[in-house]
């Protein structure tokens, strides 16, 4: 399984989350299998989303899409988001 971690400055969380929720079908169609949303404990305007993805290639295509870029601008994301492509190596019990 591949993962995509996006780190972005989202500004007003509720506004951003509304746009995020409306983008669900696009994420699914692009290969996303779901996500977990985190907020930086030291900076509530910094949000991190960890997506589970079919494969890294699909995740890369998603991050390069004009649709994602437009939705990020509309939702209030400021600055350039950071994208990290991850492969799970091992899962431990603790």
Where are these regions (language model features)?
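Short S/T/G/P-rich N-terminal loop/turn motif that feeds into the first structured element of a domain
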Residues: 1-66, 70, 78-94
């Amino acid at each position: 399984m591949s993962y995509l971690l996006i780190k972005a400055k989202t500004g007003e969380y509720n506004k951003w989350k509304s746009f995020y929720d409306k983008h669900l079908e696009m994420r699914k169609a692009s290969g996303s299998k779901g996500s977990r949303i985190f907020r930086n404990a030291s900076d509530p305007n910094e949000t991190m989303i960890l997506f589970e993805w079919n494969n890294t290639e699909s995740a890369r295509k998603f991050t390069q899409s004009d649709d994602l870029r437009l939705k990020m601008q509309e939702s209030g994301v400021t600055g350039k988001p950071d994208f990290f492509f991850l492969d799970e190596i091992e899962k431990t019990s603790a």
